[in-house]
A protein has these predicted regions:
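A conserved acidic beta->alpha catalytic loop
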Residues: 29, 37-46, 92
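A short, conserved alpha-helix in the catalytic core of glycosyltransferases
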Residues: 161-162, 166-178, 185-204, 209-210
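Short aromatic/hydrophobic "clamp" motif used to bind/position activated sugar donors
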Residues: 85
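Conserved donor NDP-sugar-binding/catalytic core segment of glycosyltransferases
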Residues: 97-133
Length: 253
């Protein structure tokens, strides 16, 4: 199976550089690394250029028009050629078996939800200043490297556990619902909308617990000024089981 790793980022090249370094440590190299950039400055573009000889990077950039994570991810999906799509945020470090385990646990008709642990501000500074190596961040972690059966299948009720900082699913399941809804602007609930529409389409949730987890670098909280608007939009999706396709998406059939 061909694998695309889609990394969202916005004006945080130091964190993105650390994330890309964690990609180089993977036991299973992704076939595509698609950086989904929500309008960063030229500094991020320069960083990506410095990695082109080490990773199969494709750059998907949208102009800076507020927080538009949905549009950014959809552009990355559009550019991808792989069967399996793995989504992470540009401040989430991956342990060496991350891609390998996502592939082992992946199954058409399921979205795999991975976990995370939050790094403190001091831990994050140590990592970004390279006082601590990326490999040592996960030095004492013990990961399960096998599917472990049906206990991972959570059905459709555990959707609140699914975060786009660490999830994977097959491309066909993503495209069937036209990806992420680009009518969500600003922080909040575009990922929950995505998961609920997947469930409405028949996709089930699988747990990646104890198998795939990321180290989420510390960052200041994003503005919540549009959360109430996004919440109203999400409630419509949540209560309408016929709502499957994104209201607005470049992936519309």
């Amino acid at each position: 199976v061909k694998v695309a790793l889609l990394i969202t980022t916005y004006n945080r090249p130091d964190a993105l550089g650390a994330v890309l370094e964690s990609v180089t440590l993977q036991t299973r190299t992704p076939d595509e690394v698609i950086v989904c950039d929500d309008g960063s400055t030229a500094t991020t573009r320069s960083l990506i250029a410095s990695w082109l000889d080490r990773l199969p990077i494709c750059y998907a950039w949208v102009s800076d028009r507020q927080f538009r994570a949905s549009m950014t991810r959809n552009l990355g999906i559009l550019k991808s050629q792989s069967d399996l799509l793995i989504f992470v945020d540009g401040d989430c470090l991956m342990p060496p078996t991350f891609i390998e385990t996502h592939v082992k646990l992946a199954q058409p008709g399921y979205v795999l939800s991975g976990g995370r642990f939050l790094c403190t501000r001091d831990e994050t500074l140590s990592i970004l200043k390279k006082d601590v190596s990326i490999s040592s961040v996960f030095g004492n972690w013990k990961f399960m490297r096998w599917p472990l059966g049906l206990f991972r299948n959570l059905g459709s009720t555990r959707w609140k556990s699914v975060r786009t900082c660490n999830l994977s699913l097959h491309r066909e399941d993503t495209v069937r619902i036209a990806g992420f809804d680009e009518s969500y602007v600003g922080w909040g609930l575009e990922d929950s909308d995505f998961v609920i529409r997947l469930i409405h389409s028949g996709v089930q949730i699988r747990s990646g617990r104890l198998g795939v987890c990321v180290a989420h670098l510390h960052h200041d909280e994003s503005s919540r000024d549009r959360l109430s608007i996004n919440h109203e939009r999400f409630q419509e999706t949540l209560t309408n089981r016929d709502h499957i396709l994104a209201n607005s998406s470049i992936l519309h059939p």
